UniProtKB/Swiss-Prot annotation:
InterPro entries assigned to the protein according to its UniProt record, in alphabetical order: RSRP1 (IPR029656)
Protein name: Arginine/serine-rich protein 1
GO cellular component: nucleus
Sites bearing Omega-N-methylarginine, chain numbering: 135
Organism per entry: Pongo abelii (Sumatran orangutan)
GO biological process: spliceosomal complex assembly
Amino acid composition bias (Basic residues), ranges on this chain: 32-123
Length: 311
């Protein structure tokens, strides 16, 4: 019994040499090795993850720094561009005011609004728009297309819808209708039944022209007919016009005579005019002869034009 107990005592040599104790020692060594390996693996994985996180954080920091730098650069560029644009606009404004004489009210800085930003994004400023409108062109929308106006001035614009440049004329029938409408409106406004028209608005019976120039009025009376088929009043007006034309021609002849005598006449009168004669061929007329010839030609034209129906 004692031997069995002594053999099984923890300090006995049998226990040291027993196979059970050797197996348990090997398993403990293996477990410690596996633990160390797993710990090293976990530490490695943790270090890898930490390195990844640190690299990501570094990338994020660098990206944020680069973004901030870009924003700062963009802001600086924006300010520099706006400054250069403002300087160029002021130069263009001064040049246009000096060259074309435009007032400063066309170039007032407008209020900051959506339209201003849109127009600037399209590459056009308010100065260009005001300059184009001042030159007679107009923008439609926010595009870059410029359409010239049909009429450059407001005086050329007709109040009617017709686009013809000839003035609008009324016929005699339309004038009579408008006169009757005006008479009715005036009578209604004044509360009377009849209105006496002034002499300038009274209608004159128009004579119908015939082959011989003699006309018959609408009421059957035969109007007075004189030279050129005109009435007495119209003939007096035509006679006044003829006298005015003759006086203008006489003034021109007198001025030309003075110029020839003083030597300040044109060069073709100094050199003379080549005239073709039927017998002697071409000959050169003296300046005085050419002047007399031109005067005779003018007077003959006046006589032929205005006095051929006098007889």
């Amino acid at each position: 019994m004692s031997t069995y107990v002594n053999d099984m005592w923890p300090g006995s040599p049998q226990e040291k040499d027993s196979p059970s104790t050797s197996r348990s020692g090997g398993s403990s060594r293996l477990s410690s090795r596996s633990r160390s390996r797993s710990f090293s693996r976990s530490s490695r994985s943790h270090s890898r993850v930490s390195s990844r996180f640190s690299s990501r954080s570094r990338c994020r920091r660098s990206r944020s720094r680069s973004r901030s730098r870009r924003r700062h650069q963009r802001k600086y560029r924006r300010y520099s561009r706006s400054y250069s644009r403002s300087r160029s606009r002021s130069r263009n404004r001064r040049y246009r005011e000096r060259r074309y004489g435009f007032s400063r009210r066309y170039y007032r800085s407008p209020s900051r609004s959506r339209s201003r930003s849109r127009s600037r994004s399209r590459g056009r400023s308010y100065c260009g728009r005001a300059y184009a409108i001042a030159r007679g062109q107009r923008y439609y929308g926010f595009g870059r297309t410029v359409y010239p106006e049909e009429h450059s001035r407001w005086r050329d614009r007709s109040r009617t819808r017709s686009r013809s440049r000839t003035p609008f004329r009324l016929s005699e029938k339309e004038r009579m209708e408008l006169l009757e409408i005006a008479k009715a409106n005036a009578a209604k406004a004044l509360g009377t039944t009849s209105i006496d028209l002034p002499a300038s608005l009274r209608t004159v019976p128009v004579a119908k022209e015939t082959s011989r120039g003699i006309g018959v009025s609408s009421n059957g009376a035969k109007p007075e007919v004189s030279i050129l088929g005109l009435s007495e009043q119209n003939f007096q007006k035509a006679n006044c016009q003829i006298m005015w034309v003759c006086s203008v021609l006489v003034d021109k002849v007198f001025i030309q005579t003075i110029r020839c005598l003083t030597g300040t006449c044109p060069s073709f009168l100094k050199r003379g005019i080549f005239m073709r004669d039927s017998t002697d061929g071409p000959k050169v007329m003296h300046r005085w002869e050419s002047f007399v010839y031109s005067c005779k030609y003018c007077l003959g034209y006046v006589k032929m034009r205005f006095f051929r129906h006098s007889n």
